[in-house]
Amino acid sequence: MLNMLISFACSALSSALMMRFVTPNMWITMAVSAVVFALVFILLTRIIMKKVGTLMEIAQKDMMANRSDKAIKELQDGLKYGPWQIYVKQQINSQIGTIYYLKRDFKEAVPFLEKGFVRNWVSTSMLAISYMKKNKTSKMVETFGKAVSGNRKEPMVYAVYAFCMDRIGERNKAIEVLKKGIAKTSDERLQENMNLLEAGKKMKMKGFGDMWYQFHLEKQGAIIKKQTKAMTGRRKQVLR
């Protein structure tokens, strides 16, 4: 990281100046050197993270205005901050990959998602789903494992993982995933879905709201169609 190298350089310079012009006392020199390193490092980190934060906000506004291509370009320009701060490049790659995934441009999304930040459970889950769609089950399981390990208190990551396991015919393993999620989060939606799987039924993800649909595992229109059909059936029963 450039900010760390610059901080070390400033620290070393302050040590040399202290020994040359102020005091030969090694302990005082080391204390001043440590303070200089910390101050420079914190200052540079704040400057870089502020620039990255501003970049993310601009990209988010562009996404909300349906200017996804512009958002991607702005984020790609932000990759120049990668050498300055740890995980910045990975976070930006996660955002770019997520945008491509939301556009259903999965071919473009995967390379960025693979270079993304593992603690971003949304982008990591999108990568796992991409592997599932390519029938790369072992890579899907491995990637979901990373998403869960970095976000143990996030209920939805367990739900998405379990949904995918059930989709590939591993219902028992899906139930195990939900059990782990319930133990970590005590989320009622996970409990409800585990009960459904144990009863031989499909999971219901509408409890997670619109966020669920970004994974493109279920079409919102299909859900509405099912709900309409169910309501129509109930009306017929009432009429009889």
Residue ranges and their predicted role:
Residues 42-46, 77-85, 113-120, 145-153, ...:
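Solenoid-like repeat scaffolds
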Residues 50, 66-67, 97-108, 134-143, ...:
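Alpha-helical linker/edge segments of TPR/alpha-solenoid repeat scaffolds
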